[in-house]
C-alpha cells in the first residue's frame, strides 16, 4: 500500500520540510523572545550586550526543540496516513496527541497523558480554525461562479469584485449589450469563414481554369483530327486484271 496523494509533500520530504520549518520558526521566535528577556534582565548600560548573549545561548536550543517536535509530528502524521489510507484532520489530531505523549514519557504516565490531551486539543483547534478559514474564503468564489448573467461578458468578472457593482446584472441595457457583442462576434466569424472559402475557391478556380483551358484547347484539335480522317477517302484498290 502506498501513501495517497495529498496537497502536501510526500512523507519523506514532508518530514524534512516540517523539521526545517519548525527549526526556523523556533529560531526566529526564540531569538525575539530571548533578546527581549535578556535586555530586560540585564543591568543598565549593557542591555544590548545581554540581549545578544541571551539570544546566542538560548535561540539554537529553542529551534532544536521545535525541530524535534515537528519531526515527530510529521512522522506520526505519515504513519496515520499510511495506516488509514486517507488524508483528513483526524491524522493531525492523533499525531499531535502522540507527539505530546511521546515527548513526556520520561516524566511518567500522568504527565504523558496530560501532554497527549493538550497536544490533541491544540491540533484540533488549529485544524478547526483552518477549516473555518477555508469555508469563509470559499464563499465569495462560489457566489461569483453561481452568477450566470455576468460570466459571459468580457471584463464583468473583474467588475463583480468591485463595491457597488452587484446590481449591474439587473440593468436593462446589460442584456442588449451582451446580445450585440454576441452578434458582432458571430458576424466576424462568418466573414472570416467566407474569406477563407473565397480564397480557397479562387485558388481552386484558378488551377481549374488552367486545366479547363488545356482541355478546351485539346478537345477542338482532337475533333478536327477526327473530322479530317472521316472526310478523307481511301484510294481505290488496284486490280491486275487485263482489259
From Swiss-Prot:
It is found in: Mitochondrion inner membrane; Mitochondrion outer membrane. Residues 184-198 have a biased composition (Polar residues). Residues 166-243 are annotated as: Disordered. Residues 166-183 have a biased composition (Low complexity). Disruption phenotype: Lethal when homozygous. Gene3D superfamilies: 6-Phosphogluconate Dehydrogenase, domain 3. One of its GO terms (biological process) is protein insertion into mitochondrial inner membrane. Keywords: Membrane, Mitochondrion, Mitochondrion inner membrane, Mitochondrion outer membrane, Protein transport, Repeat, Translocation, Transmembrane, Transmembrane helix, Transport. One of its GO terms (cellular component) is mitochondrial outer membrane. Coiled coil: none annotated. Residues 149-178 are annotated as: 10 X approximate repeats GMQ/P. Residues 211-228 have a biased composition (Basic and acidic residues). Component of the TIM17:23 complex at least composed of TIM23, TIM17 and TIM50. The complex interacts with the TIM44 component of the PAM complex. Interacts with TIM23-2. This is Mitochondrial import inner membrane translocase subunit TIM17-2. It comes from Arabidopsis thaliana. The lineage of its organism: Eukaryota, Viridiplantae, Streptophyta, Embryophyta, Tracheophyta.
Amino acid at each position: 500500500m502506498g501513501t495517497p496523494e495529498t496537497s502536501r509533500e510526500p512523507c519523506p520530504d514532508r518530514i524534512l520540510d516540517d523539521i526545517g520549518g519548525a527549526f526556523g520558526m523556533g529560531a526566529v521566535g526564540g531569538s525575539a523572545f530571548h533578546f527581549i528577556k535578556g535586555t530586560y534582565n540585564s543591568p543598565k548600560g549593557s542591555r544590548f550586550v545581554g540581549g545578544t548573549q541571551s539570544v546566542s545561548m538560548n535561540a539554537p536550543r529553542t529551534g532544536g526543540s521545535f525541530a524535534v517536535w515537528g519531526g515527530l509530528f510529521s512522522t506520526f502524521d505519515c504513519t496515520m496516513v499510511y495506516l488509514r489510507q486517507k488524508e483528513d484532520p483526524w491524522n493531525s489530531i492523533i499525531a499531535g496527541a502522540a507527539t505530546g505523549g511521546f515527548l513526556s514519557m520520561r516524566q511518567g504516565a500522568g504527565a504523558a497523558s496530560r501532554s497527549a490531551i493538550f497536544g490533541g486539543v491544540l491540533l484540533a483547534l488549529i485544524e478547526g480554525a483552518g477549516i473555518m478559514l477555508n469555508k469563509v474564503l470559499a464563499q465569495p468564489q462560489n457566489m461569483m461562479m453561481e452568477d450566470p448573467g455576468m460570466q459571459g461578458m468580457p471584463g464583468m468578472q473583474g467588475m463583480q469584485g468591485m463595491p457597488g457593482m452587484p446590481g449591474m446584472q439587473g440593468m436593462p441595457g446589460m442584456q442588449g449589450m451582451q446580445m450585440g457583442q454576441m452578434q458582432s462576434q458571430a458576424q466576424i466569424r462568418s466573414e472570416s469563414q467566407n474569406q477563407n472559402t473565397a480564397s480557397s475557391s479562387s485558388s481552386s478556380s484558378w488551377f481549374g481554369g488552367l486545366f479547363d483551358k488545356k482541355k478546351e484547347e485539346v478537345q477542338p484539335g482532337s475533333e478536327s483530327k477526327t473530322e479530317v480522317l472521316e472526310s478523307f477517302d481511301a484510294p481505290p484498290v488496284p486490280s491486275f486484271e487485263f482489259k
